[in-house]
Amino acid sequence: MTTAPTTAMALPSRGRVGMACMIITESALFTIFVVAYLYYIGKSLSGPYPRQVLDLPVLATVALLSSSITITLAVRALRGAQHGAFNLWWFATIALGAFFLGATAVEWDHLIYQHNLTIWTNLFGTTYYTLVGFHAGHVTIGLLLLGLVLIFSLAGAVRTAHAERVEVLSWYWHFVDAVWVVVFTVVYVIGR
């Protein structure tokens, strides 16, 4: 009786497993905030209300979603040992994310100083700033991590051998982008 040779299945790296676990955990937290936002839509006893003060952040959304493309191109460039292209695409990702974060800051300035909407104003203000702020916090963390990688790369410390680690970090950025699609839909489409 002959047996077929068996091949060992490679286990995913600790980085991949760790990032996947973190994304699952963060997804649960975002789900709680999204459900709370949906539950409290229209329950504020006083204004301002979403339809009165929220504009669609279209350019910011396009910038953030485009950053998923640029980070994918950066990872591909690093895998192909194209370090100049990696730095360019990685920088583009940071620039697009920074534009998104800046647009969020401008929106908040407008809401606070022109519409007097703060986290304490009403249920809408509380749930809006909690959900959108939680996302903005994740964008900020992502930008800091992306910035560190760029600094190391410009110093020559990021090589093709680091492509898997860079790709794992890109998963976080894709997660931040995917969460924004949900937040945008809930806050700016359904919630208005």
Spell out what each predicted region is:
Residues 1-192:
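...captures the hydrophobic TM-helix bundle architecture rather than a specific catalytic motif
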